[in-house]
Amino acid sequence: MKMTLIAILTCAAVLVLHTTAAEELEAESQLMEVGMPDTELEAVDEERLFECSVSCEIEKEGNKDCKKKKCKGGWKCKFNMCVKV
């Protein structure tokens, strides 16, 4: 009975992971099909850099250590800037 339950839960977890990965690939392919002009992509990059550096500066003003803002969508905060992972 326990083995059956473990097998069902394992299959469910694998199914969820594959579904999530498939949705990400579909979203990427739709973005590539529609396409964004380079200027729009540059604006998005600049916004991410600005958001990350401003959040650190605001936190430093309160005499606290800078806790870097988490960047989303495959970006991470490094040296007060969001960089692509």
UniProtKB/Swiss-Prot annotation:
SUPFAM superfamilies: omega toxin-like. Keywords: Disulfide bond, Neurotoxin, Postsynaptic neurotoxin, Secreted, Signal, Toxin. This is U4-theraphotoxin-Hhn1a. PROSITE patterns: HWTX_2. Disulfide bonds join 52-66, 56-77, 71-82. Neurotoxin active on both insects and mammals. It comes from Cyriopagopus hainanus (Chinese bird spider). The keyword Aminoacyl-tRNA synthetase does not apply. Pfam families: Toxin_20 (PF08089). It is found in: Secreted. Belongs to the neurotoxin 12 (Hwtx-2) family. 02 (Hwtx-2) subfamily. Monomer. The keyword Signal applies.
